Amino acid sequence: MSNMSQDDVTTGLRTVQQGLEALREEHSTISNTLETSVKGVKEDEAPLPKQKLSQINDNLDKLVCGVDETSLMLMVFQLTQGMDAQHQKYQAQRRRLCQENAWLRDELSSTQIKLQQSEQMVAQLEEENKHLKYMASIKQFDDGTQSDTKTSVDVGPQPVTNETLQELGFGPEDEEDMNASQFNQPTPANQMAASANVGYEIPARLRTLHNLVIQYASQGRYEVAVPLCKQALEDLEKTSGHDHPDVATMLNILALVYRDQNKYKEAANLLNEALSIREKCLGESHPAVAATLNNLAVLFGKRGKFKDAEPLCKRALEIREKVLGDDHPDVAKQLNNLALLCQNQGKYEEVEKYYKRALEIYESKLGPDDPNVAKTKNNLSSAYLKQGKYKEAEELYKQILTRAHEREFGQISGENKPIWQIAEEREENKHKGEGATANEQAGWAKAAKVDSPTVTTTLKNLGALYRRQGKYEAAETLEDVALRAKKQHEPLRSGAMGGIDEMSQSMMASTIGGSRNSMTTSTSQTGLKNKLMNALGFNS
C-alpha cells in the first residue's frame, strides 16, 4: 500500500465505490422481488422467503454504509491531495523568498560597503583640510612657545586656583552635584587642563598634544582623544622611561578622559600610577602631587565614596598649606572641597569650620566682591539649612544679594533697595492690602539683570526659606526674579560653543589658531592620529 501512487489509490477507491453501487442496486432489486413474492405466498409457506428477505435487507444496509464510507474516504483523500499541493506551493514560495532575501542581503551589504567607502573618502578629504589648518596653528603655537616657555606653560587662562573639586565636578552651589549619578557631562577643557598639569611645566611638544587631547575630550570625542593619549604614552615611555613627570601628566589626562566615560576602574588605576610617579620624581609635597590626589578624590566623589575621598582631599590640603601658605586662595578652594565632602557625610561641625576658614581667606586675599566669597557663603548657608539654622542661613543669603546689588547698582538707599528687601515689603503690603509700587517693579527689573549663577541660586534658596516661614508673597517675588534672570541670559549662553565657558573657548582658540568648528564627521581615526603624532614629533 505504501508503494501505491496517489493516482492508484484514487482509482482503487473509485472502483470499489462503483462495485459497491452495483451490488447495492442488485440487492435492492432482489429485495423488491422477494417482497412481492412474500405477499403472494400462503402463510404456511412464508417463513423461508421472509428469512431470505431479511438477509437481503441486512446486506443492503451494509452495502449502503460501505458506499458512504467509500465516498467519505475518497473525499478525505482528495482534501489531503489538495493540502499536499498547497504545502508544496508554500514551500516553493518560501524557497523563492529565501533566495530573494539572500539576494537583498547581498545587495544591502554591497551598498553599505560602498557607503562606508564614500564616507571614508569624504572624511579623509575633510581631515586633510583640518590637518593643514592644524599644522599651521601648531607651527604658530610652537613659534610662540619657543620665545618664552616659562610664561606660556599654563594651558589656557588659569585663575588663581584651577584644579579643585569644584572645577572638576563638585558643583559649588547645587548639592545634587555631589551625587554620582549627576556626573554625565564631559569635563570642560580648561578644567581638565588645570587638573592634569598643575605645578609642573609641560614641554612645548607635549603641551601641544595635551591641548589637542583636551579639546577632543571636552567635546566628547573620546574615540580620538584616547588613541592620541595612548600613542603619546607609548612614545614617552620609550624615550623618557616610565618614571618621568611627562608620563605622569599623560596618565593624568588619560585618566580624566576615562573618568568622563564612566570608566572609573581604569581611571583610578591610571591616577594611582601617576601619583606614584609624581611622588617619586617630584616629591611627596609637590603641587602636582596635590593635583593628582585631588583628581582621585573627584573620582571617588563621582562614585559616591565620600568617605574614601576625604583623606585624599585632606592630604592635598596639607600639601597646599605647606607649599603655598595657610592663607592662599588655593587653600581656600581645597577647604571648600573638603567641606563639601564632609557635608555629604553629615559632619556639619567640620563643614562650618572649613567654610568659615575658606571665607576668611577669600575675603582677606581676594576682597568681598570676589565670586568665591558669594559661592562659599551660599555653601555655608546650605549647611546651615541642613542643620535647621534658618536664621543664620537667611542672614548669609541676604548678605549675598545685598553685596551683588551694591556691586551692580550702587549704595543701598530708600530708592535703591536689594530684592530681598523689596520681597519682604511686598509681604507686608500684602497683609495691608497694598499693591506693588513703581520702585518695587524697578527693583525686580534690576535684580533680573544680575547674571550670576550664585545670585540665581541664592534667590531660589532664600525663596524656599521664605516659603518654609510662610512668607509666600516674598517667596514668589524672589522666584519670579530668578526666572526672569534665567530667561534673559539663556539666549546669550546658548550661543556658546556647546556649553563650554569662555575660558575653554580661549584655550581652544590658542590651540587651533582661532578655528572653533568642532570636527563632527565620522573620521578615519588611524590616519588622523598618525598625522598628528608625526606633526608633533612622536613616532606613530
From Swiss-Prot:
Keyword hit for Ribonucleoprotein: no
Gene3D superfamilies: Tetratricopeptide repeat domain
Species name: Caenorhabditis elegans
Record's signal peptide: none
Renumbered ranges of TPR repeats: 206-239, 248-281, 290-323, 332-365, 374-407, 456-489
Protein name (database record): Kinesin light chain
A cellular component annotation (GO) from this entry: microtubule
An example Gene Ontology molecular-function term: kinesin binding
